[in-house]
């Protein structure tokens, strides 16, 4: 079978250097949303490595674009921080702890928990709510890999309780997150949405 040869420029285009990774673009410069509100929904620092050129909650800043339905990023969370419950309906989300430790909350109300230490992995199937928090005494670092159909990256919903937490913290902020394509309907019967 014939193989493909890559030029030096093509190799450079498909290479990501950790030192050059940029924070996700969707919320980076949004001054209408407090850091505390961002911290409820996202890891404090998300650095996309690989993205598809489709609508997704991470924006359009990545080192590499297009990898056959794969999204990959590095998340850094300070102690006690991490994104709350959310659900990817069409994609698998797999987490690998690079440094520190995280506690994952799984289920519509986070009723199940699993702690991951350095080098541990949790793979969450589509349709399951999950959130996580850094339970270490210093920054923890997570590699996240999302797989599934390339056109299914805009598949994230959050439980109503997340909307309530946001509104209690910063009234009127929900439209900023809804503009990213996030809906606060996870766990609701489709007839009630």
What are these regions (language model features)?
Residues 90-103:
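Glycine- and acidic-residue-biased ligand/ion/polar-headgroup-sensing regions
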Residues 1-69, 172-193:
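A short, N-terminal "cap"/entry segment at the start of jelly-roll beta-barrel domains
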């Amino acid at each position: 079978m014939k193989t493909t040869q890559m030029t030096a420029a093509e190799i450079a285009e498909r290479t990501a250097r950790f030192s050059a990774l940029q924070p996700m673009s969707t919320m980076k410069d949004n001054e209408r949303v407090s850091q505390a509100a961002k911290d409820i929904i996202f890891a404090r620092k998300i650095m996309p490595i690989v993205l598809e050129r489709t609508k997704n909650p991470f924006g359009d800043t990545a080192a590499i674009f297009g990898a056959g339905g794969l999204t990959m990023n590095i998340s850094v969370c300070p102690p006690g921080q991490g994104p709350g419950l959310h659900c990817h309906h069409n994609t698998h989300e797999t987490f690998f702890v690079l440094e520190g430790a995280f506690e994952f909350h799984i289920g519509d109300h986070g009723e199940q928990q699993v702690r991951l230490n350095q080098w541990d992995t949790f793979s969450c199937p589509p349709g399951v709510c999950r959130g996580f928090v850094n339970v270490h005494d210093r920054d923890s670092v997570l590699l996240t890999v999302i797989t599934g159909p390339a056109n299914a990256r805009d598949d994230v919903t959050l439980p109503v309780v997340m909307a309530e937490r946001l509104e209690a913290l910063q009234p009127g902020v929900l439209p900023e997150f809804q503009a990213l394509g996030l809906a606060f309907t996870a766990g609701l019967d489709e007839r009630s949405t």
